Amino acid sequence: GIVIVDPDNDTLNEYIKKHRQATEYRDRLGGLVGKPTVTTDGIPLVLKANIDSPEQVDAAIMAGCEGIGLVRTEMLLVQRGRYPSADEQTEWYSDIAQRAYPLSVTFRAFDVGSDKFREGIPHHEENPALGLRGIRFLLYRPDIFESQICAILQASVHRNIRLMLPMIATLEELEQAK
């Protein structure tokens, strides 16, 4: 988020309007909690949430989500400003898995790169937008990848955890990740 000190009237009115719109939207969605999630032709859907932190699990479940479809684990890096230890990761992943239990949780392995946390990425990339990110970064830095996988495995005591590997483009990348 951002902090605006001493906003002018136009800025203040803009944020008051945004807050009002968000409140109205949240109120409309609140009326849907507990109702079946189906397409217009009656096909049932499973509604899962995408989250950035353990605190968001509770809100997702209260909103009627049937699990956590994606945990953006790279946000742990952004929040801390560094790569966390395996123990710190295990604690974070365990907190999320326990809050969601018995619902499933899908953790996406660190998807760092051009738009997010760049520590450990070479300064020159041929194509920074598509270059060394996702699984390619994790294969480039096996120490980080292995630490994260170990932490996720240690956090899986309730067996409600799934793993997503980001941006796999080739069969070779998948085989290397195994």
Task: List each language-model region with its residue ranges.
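Conformationally flexible catalytic loops at phosphate/diphosphate-handling active centers
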Residues: 1
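Long, charged amphipathic helices and adjacent flexible linkers at domain junctions
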Residues: 6-42
